[in-house]
């Protein structure tokens, strides 16, 4: 379940028509959770590493040189890009495990080259990138898979040349918290009808098993290293900064989180990417507890007004997850259902309607839509009009496009 989401600049019922609120830089009426797509940057490396481990296409102990010539593109790591003469601040040859922890673009490039574009593309599809979650809210963006060329495929390994929504990232990361099983995000957990004395309650909805539990566990171990390794970890603070002592930045009650940091270039309206020193999207995903996460935290900051520091994110993550951990076993049910009976949902006639809109409608009633085919209209439905079903019932929708049967999960 999505427990909380927020964004700034914000819009509320109180300031909806306020001119000053609307004139804030980057103001939008859209939800950044699902109505905005962007190039996510290096947090995508979590999916690449899990995919490479699952397909046995990476040896974590093997070493590589941290510069790659790819056609007319030279892929450097961040420490070489930041130096005036292109020299490395860290060793020029590292292992793939070290490369992940230091967020090496060159290392991820070599992994994709070893996997091949077709295999990497198949894993992106297993994680359902390019596919909306259909959480029941309108205006959801689809994101986009990388173009079918070698450079775009390579760049997608470090989160450029591919676009996602925040909720698509979170859907993919649910597999890290569920032993490889991916869950569809839910924003409504329960619906109570006091007039009828009934309730509908959602349960976990498995929508994929993109990689093995072993691949997930090994990737999470590397993510712990991102936060705890004093040499390679990008969220390990080596010197005092912003009032923080040296050490891991993401901590709950003295225990580390599993972390991946990200920096993404932003596409310019005129083509190419923005060139300013801080014209980036900075981000981090943190999972706690790392061995079997109860909570997944993701935050990004676009073009920060002050000099960028990862502490801007850790200062939000640490107290928030600490508080969530404290109350997770105390949290009362949103609505007491004692004395109520399980409700039913009456199906409508969906034939001729857009499958996406139908899916949103079904999801709002805590049903589980399954779209078959790639068409623009529903031609048949598995549950007839007027039939009553309980919450979480799968409803298959056949479309007028190519009939591709999706994977089915319990």
Where are the predicted features?
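Beta-lactam-recognizing serine transpeptidase/beta-lactamase-like catalytic domain environment
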Residues: 1-42, 47-301
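Short, surface-exposed linear patches
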Residues: 16-18, 179-180, 193, 231-233, ...
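Short amphipathic alpha-helical segments
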Residues: 211-218, 312-316, 354
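Outer/extracellular conduits and scaffolds centered on Gram-negative outer-membrane beta-barrels
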Residues: 279, 285, 306-309, 313
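Ligand-recognition elements built from short beta-strands and adjacent flexible loops
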Residues: 299-301, 308-311, 318-410
